[in-house]
């Protein structure tokens, strides 16, 4: 969790300029015949904000970060449930949590992200499921390549109002930008698996909390890929476009390209 920056409960992180770039959160459980009910999580490739933490972004970039979650090479044995979660390639906002303090249960509010400028771009989430026989259920989740907003977390993206003389291009350049982020998922060698699925959701923002947007550019976050190796695997893609096997790179109208890890 938090390949570049980790903000704890009660912490405040402010970004005014510069880059958080080229980081990754990576998880790959090792092979094991006796392992059961195993999940693999990778969250917050660039920035992970705990419940109770705050991230203020006034400028700069969170770019080219990634979360990668894998499970593979599990041998035959008892029925198992395997899930690979890859969430928040750029930024992960943890949802509200319950903690016990002096015997009492206390609710910690979800993380808060305030963005008034800067760019979240070319981040990626990628999840892959590998060899597994006799599994009852297996799902790969690749969600929120730009920003993942957990339950109870709050994401405020609000650019300044432009004067009436500004052109559309000038206004867009001044707005906070969430662009060219990508999600991808894959299950391979799953011929014995039932009830398998790939979920790819929210190339720009995955919202399970509260998102407030005003004067922002959220565009070209529709690059995603999902692959499967047998007819028993279901593919679910929401608000993204499907790219067939072998087509891992897309070229946008401005000449820029994005490629899955």
Region locations from a protein language model:
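Surface-exposed loop/turn motifs in large extracellular/passenger domains
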Residues: 1-261
